[in-house]
Design a protein with these regions (language model features):
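Short linear sequence motif anchored by a di-proline
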Residues: 1-189
Length: 189
């Protein structure tokens, strides 16, 4: 499904025509990817790099931001972005590596890998951004992700899009009611 078509036709969002080419592909940390954000009084898709520069070591970007950090009393590097610069990462699915491993014939070990997706054409994941970069927002796992990982992306349903981008998002932290399709990938050979 085309991202722009889904946003403008299915969700009826007043999206300005993106000035970027939107390719449907896998995205990985340290790569550019389109994110949906509200800037200059316009809802727009823009390319940003996945990973905030670390204040400790700029060569080691930070790819995930725990939602709980926003509610802690001590200041964090994420505070301004959580308050004013929220975005949505648009994907067909996301994946996680499990703690469990398997061994192939040559003795090499691999972690089991799982794919997760919502029943919507596009899986929307909460993000925060700064000038050139974005970070994925994570929360406690739900029943589908808990057996595989101790965190999960903060999934946003289409009906919650405006709340994440513009309003108080406290009610979005608990994702236990979100249902995800889970698919274990075949083992390497």
């Amino acid at each position: 499904m085309q991202i722009k078509k889904y946003l403008t036709e299915d969700l009826n969002l007043p999206l300005i025509d993106p000035q970027i080419e939107i390719k449907q592909r896998d995205i990985f940390p340290n790569q550019a990817a389109p994110v949906l954000l509200y800037h200059d009084d316009k809802l727009q898709l823009v390319n940003k790099n996945w990973g905030y520069p670390s204040p400790v070591d700029p060569k080691k970007p930070m790819f995930n931001a725990r939602i709980e950090r926003f509610y802690e009393n001590k200041p964090s590097m994420w505070d301004h972005s959580f308050a004013k610069q929220r975005c949505l990462i648009l994907s067909s699915e996301f994946f996680e590596y499990a703690k469990t491993t398997y061994q192939v014939a040559n003795g090499k070990k691999y972690h089991d890998r799982y794919r997760f997706k919502t029943n919507n054409p596009i899986t929307m994941i909460a993000g925060i951004y700064d000038q050139n970069d974005f970070s994925m927002v994570t929360t406690a796992p739900n029943k589908d992700t808990a057996p595989i990982h101790n965190r999960m992306p903060l999934i946003i349903e289409p009906s919650e899009l405006r709340r994440w981008l513009f309003q108080n998002f406290t009610s979005l932290i608990d994702r236990s009611a979100i249902n995800l399709e889970v698919q274990k990938e075949p083992h390497q050979k």
